């Protein structure tokens, strides 16, 4: 997990850099809650308690955390379509799921702004592209219940933060590009 409040005994804590907070500030808290390993940026300052756990230093904590999460959760739907763009992602993944279903592929799902939608499954989400650990857990959960085809939204934030790294995407689709989210990306 990348949230020190969710750490339990035996967990890996990913100390991710953020725009407002740096996860390395929460390493001691994560260790107190039972983390046995921490993933940190190679230049991070470590608390004294870090000597008691495995420390993995890297130049890209977000990318490496996604790769670790994909290895930990292992299972993924056989076919994944990721859709990005300023607008139209939600409609596009919904259309893809509907087209699969109409063509006889009933083991299909969509994941994004509206949450997760599949036959017999409806879970609401908080982010267009879930955080890294949640995304890879969701991919594994969907595969475990027999979902073979997934259309998912890939937000620009999610892509920039490497949340989808480790996901076995077969097809990537781009809807459009406009000036939205320049507060985050700064330029086009």
Model-assigned labels for residue ranges:
Residues 1-67, 71:
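N-terminal leader/targeting and accessory segments in enzymes
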